[in-house]
A protein has these predicted regions:
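Short alpha-helix-to-loop micro-motif enriched in aromatics/charged/Gly
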Residues: 72-77
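Glycine- and acidic-residue-biased ligand/ion/polar-headgroup-sensing regions
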Residues: 54-67, 84-85
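A cytosolic small-molecule/anion-sensing beta-strand core signal
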Residues: 42, 60-61, 83, 107
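Cyclic nucleotide-binding regulatory module and flanking cytosolic helices
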Residues: 1-42, 87, 92-94
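Short phosphate-coordinating micro-motif centered on Lys-Gly-acidic
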Residues: 45-52
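Polybasic "coupling" helices that flank or enter modular domains
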Residues: 124, 128-191
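Phosphate-/nucleic-acid-contacting segments
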Residues: 167-232
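Cyclic-nucleotide recognition modules
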Residues: 28, 34, 78-135, 142
Length: 232
């Protein structure tokens, strides 16, 4: 993990375009940006909430996996896949609690960080920050709700189809964010195993739903994929 003091133009742009600080006056943005430093996590850097609860992060680029793990079995469950303009850890920020959560960079991840107490000070100083933070928390809760519904009512092929649809660029018919993930990482997103996901991917390929090559996947029959997503 590398740290850089202060922020450059990219860092300022990240702050000014983030949902939390967008439309703030320029002098306020400059003051806020001056309190952030840039961090670089090389691929597969891991950390946990205990180590990071004193800092608030905003992602500039790359993907960060937020997950829990069963120490006895080694199985993982991925709660969120954070990307550009996402931020963490919201729970530690608003409640100060230490929850059991882990983070792993899936590739090099660049982010900005500031002290949690500084962020809390801004929440008191700028009330609209609270509204925007609540909106973000609401969206995260909806993701967890969607997972609970999918896990309860849908079989694994349908869950897999829904994950693909959620990450599909409908213009290019190509996947974004999860396109180059291993089958094990994809399994962690839907509560399954690598072997089961691999089997269903091969079924999707045989049925003419997907075109699969090395670390690339393309939807070639959207109607069939939509049908799969409904347990049919």
């Amino acid at each position: 993990m590398k740290l850089k003091g202060g922020v450059n133009g990219i860092g300022y742009n990240t702050i000014s375009n983030n949902i939390l600080f967008k439309d703030f006056e320029q002098n306020i943005l400059s003051e806020i940006a001056s309190n952030f430093v840039e961090e670089i996590w090389p691929a597969h850097t891991c950390s946990n909430c205990e180590n990071l609860k004193h800092k608030f992060h905003i992602i500039i680029s790359g993907r960060l996996k937020v997950f829990q793990t069963d120490k006895e079995t080694g199985r993982e469950f991925t709660l969120f896949l954070l990307t550009k303009n996402d931020f963490f850890d919201v729970i530690s920020l608003v409640d100060g609690c230490n929850h059991k959560i882990y983070y792993e960079s899936l590739e090099e991840v660049k982010m900005l960080s500031t002290a949690t107490f500084t962020m809390r000070k801004w929440l008191k100083t700028y009330p609209k920050l609270n509204e925007r933070l609540l909106s973000y928390i609401g969206k995260q809760l909806l993701r967890v709700e969607d997972y609970a519904v999918n896990h309860t009512f849908f079989e694994i092929p349908a869950r897999l189809a829904r994950l693909i649809l959620e990450n599909l660029n409908h213009k290019s018919q190509k996947l974004e964010y999860i396109n180059d993930l291993s089958n094990e990482e994809i399994a962690n997103l839907i509560g399954s195993t690598r072997a089961v996901v691999n089997r269903h991917f091969q079924d999707f390929k045989k049925e003419g739903i997907l075109k699969i090559s090395r670390k690339k996947m393309e939807v070639i029959n959207l109607p069939l994929l939509l049908k799969k997503a409904t347990n049919e």
